[in-house]
């Protein structure tokens, strides 16, 4: 069985009236160890034939077999495996990647074989040393002469073994001395057992081969052998490995090339990132503002008590009948306090009136409350003491004042122990409350607190309360507790002549409302992310066009479609992730400035918003980078190589 068998190979370019028949019923066979020169003038079809033999192109019709296996039935990745594992290409224009060193160019085919980094470097250095380039391992192609570049190309062809060497005009771009040196190397490869297929238009170069096939106008006109072929020897090559290092090395190579591509066009990359930066910064900042405002509001709610339910007479706030409803009593509060899910219950009654101290008269509000009220409402004592259970039981004529009362009446003296008059009733000051920065309502109101028994018995003369504040136990569900209290009071009153205000319900409403606002504003900010994503897609399409030749080179040395897809996808994701991180940093800087000048509520950047931003930018990179990457992966190797 011949190594290569072609039967009736035809190749057409163009269509319709412009269709050109390039190869016409080409049939030939090549044995292992042959050195074949395909000669012909420009346009004869010799390069097209070599491209088909090297699986860079496909025939329009006919059969092409390697070791008896029909290539026409192979998938793109199977053809890539042939190029990677058995073929080595020597191009007229060298086709080295300009961004890589000589060592890296030579080692590149082994990346797609899954060879480890040390193994790749050692083999590449050995090949370069054998070809007289030991001192040029770290040089880039632009730092090498034409002959040196071609020797690097030869070393690359041998990296994975190069059982079959395809040489396309290997001396065409070289001076006479360099061309002679390259042909000597090719002779040595043949003598070492490599099958060599060389394309040339020069009869002198073709004379080096032991078999010459001449093509004219797409047809073989002669096939002569002047020397018997050398018996083939086994050509050693790197074996493909299926291990974690296989995928790791390919990822590292793809990532490195992506970084180089981004850095090669710094300004373009920055402008591409700009849409992502603005979008991510907007989203993170909006979420931070939402978190800060929500946190501030919830702190304000906490200032009036957490896990609390307030019970009022009437059907709701603003009910004109509520003042005539007098069924909410101290007994209700006592019964409520005995429920298993209740931590405490304190009634509250209030009265407005004139507050007098010495010759000063002020309008103030006096609240009659229980001893637990201050703890339930989260009020803090600045000085003195709070009234206790005994004070409540004994109708003690004591009062706790707020900071406003202290400032108005006792600006220059200690209020503790002083007696003030409220509606002409004497009350002894026993404590002063701290100013409540988070309190709702008018902060200028003068407020006093006394035992509810004192207020009801000595000031208002009423037996009902204005409200009852209930503290629910931490392990109890406030919604269930609210229903239980409703059922209890309905049973006691015979009707539902009261309504409740659940602090947790307010919290839920605030969280829901701020969440909706954050979502709405974030949706608007996401538009800039979409615009940024379109910019990434556009620039990646440009990158694919600019690097089409590079894609062709990688495919020629064995890159799978998945390798090409991975490389360009990583590049898109890299741009977006960097943009996302810069956007997060920008948002953090904005929050620092904002928090310095605005003290009412902070911008609160959460870890989840940062993680979400990075995940979002990664998702955009994948979503908008896939189409350009997929376009690159589906390029035909020979079409890609033909691009300048």
UniProtKB/Swiss-Prot annotation:
- Return the InterPro entries for the record: AAA+_ATPase (IPR003593), ABC3_permease_C (IPR003838), ABC_transporter-like_ATP-bd (IPR003439), ABC_transporter-like_CS (IPR017871), MacB-like_ATP-bd (IPR017911), MacB_PCD (IPR025857), Macrolide_Exporter_MacB (IPR050250), P-loop_NTPase (IPR027417)
Keywords from the named record: Antibiotic resistance, ATP-binding, Cell inner membrane, Cell membrane, Membrane, Nucleotide-binding, Translocase, Transmembrane, Transmembrane helix, Transport
Residues annotated as transmembrane: 270-290, 524-544, 574-594, 607-627
Under the heading CDD domains, the entry gives: ABC_MJ0796_LolCDE_FtsE (cd03255)
Kindly list the places in or outside the cell where this protein is found, as annotated in its UniProt entry.
Answer: Cell inner membrane
Every ABC transporter domain range: 4-242
- Write out the GO cellular component annotations: plasma membrane
Q: What is its main location?
A: membrane
Residues that bind ATP:
40-47
The UniProt entry lists membrane topology as: Multi-pass membrane protein
Q: EC class of this enzyme?
A: translocase
The GO molecular function terms of this record are: ATP binding; ATP hydrolysis activity; transmembrane transporter activity
Q: Which EC numbers does the record give?
A: 7.6.2.-
What are its GO biological-process terms? response to antibiotic
Supply the PROSITE patterns for this chain. Answer: ABC_TRANSPORTER_1, ABC_TRANSPORTER_2, MACB
Recorded family membership: Belongs to the ABC transporter superfamily. Macrolide exporter (TC 3.A.1.122) family.
| PANTHER family xrefs | MACROLIDE EXPORT ATP-BINDING_PERMEASE PROTEIN MACB, MEMBRANE COMPONENT OF TRANSPORTER-RELATED
Q: How does it assemble?
A: Homodimer.
Q: What does this protein do?
A: Non-canonical ABC transporter that contains transmembrane domains (TMD), which form a pore in the inner membrane, and an ATP-binding domain (NBD), which is responsible for energy generation. Confers resistance against macrolides.
This chain's protein is named: Macrolide export ATP-binding/permease protein MacB
Q: Which organism is it from?
A: Neisseria meningitidis serogroup A / serotype 4A (strain DSM 15465 / Z2491)
